[in-house]
Amino acid sequence: MAANPSGQGFQNKNRVAILAELDKEKRKLLMQNQSSTNHPGASIALSRPALNKDFRDHAEQQHIAAQQKAALQHAHAHSSGYFITQDSAFGNLILPVLPRLDPE
């Protein structure tokens, strides 16, 4: 039941190597950013992250739409109520529709 110290050491070395690689990449990106701000013709490189962000936003919206559809189908299959998809400040994918009954 003793922990395997060699396996733990390997994991730590792996983590250190990953962190070092990330730090090196970060420094490289910072250097590229500094050089592009010094040269006005290098603004093309700055527009690419915006394109990637738009692509990520679109992919995220498609993922949310798929989740909403799945939640809506599940709710309709397992409940006698009626539900709609609606953006919610509380993160709900679907909301129940409750009928208003006139007081008698």
Swiss-Prot record:
Keyword Membrane attached: no
Modified residues (N-acetylalanine): A2
Keyword annotations: Acetylation, DNA damage, DNA repair, Nucleus
GO terms of biological process kind: DNA damage response; DNA repair; response to ionizing radiation
Chief place of localization: nucleus
UniProt GO cellular component terms: nucleoplasm; nucleus; SOSS complex
Location in or out of the cell: Nucleus
Subunit structure: Component of the SOSS complex, composed of SOSS-B (SOSS-B1/NABP2 or SOSS-B2/NABP1), SOSS-A/INTS3 and SOSS-C/INIP. SOSS complexes containing SOSS-B1/NABP2 are more abundant than complexes containing SOSS-B2/NABP1. Interacts with INTS3; the interaction is direct.
Family the entry assigns: Belongs to the SOSS-C family.
Described function: Component of the SOSS complex, a multiprotein complex that functions downstream of the MRN complex to promote DNA repair and G2/M checkpoint. The SOSS complex associates with single-stranded DNA at DNA lesions and influences diverse endpoints in the cellular DNA damage response including cell-cycle checkpoint activation, recombinational repair and maintenance of genomic stability. Required for efficient homologous recombination-dependent repair of double-strand breaks (DSBs) and ATM-dependent signaling pathways.
Identification of the protein by name: SOSS complex subunit C
UniProt organism field: Bos taurus
Highest classification ranks of the organism: Eukaryota, Metazoa, Chordata, Craniata, Vertebrata
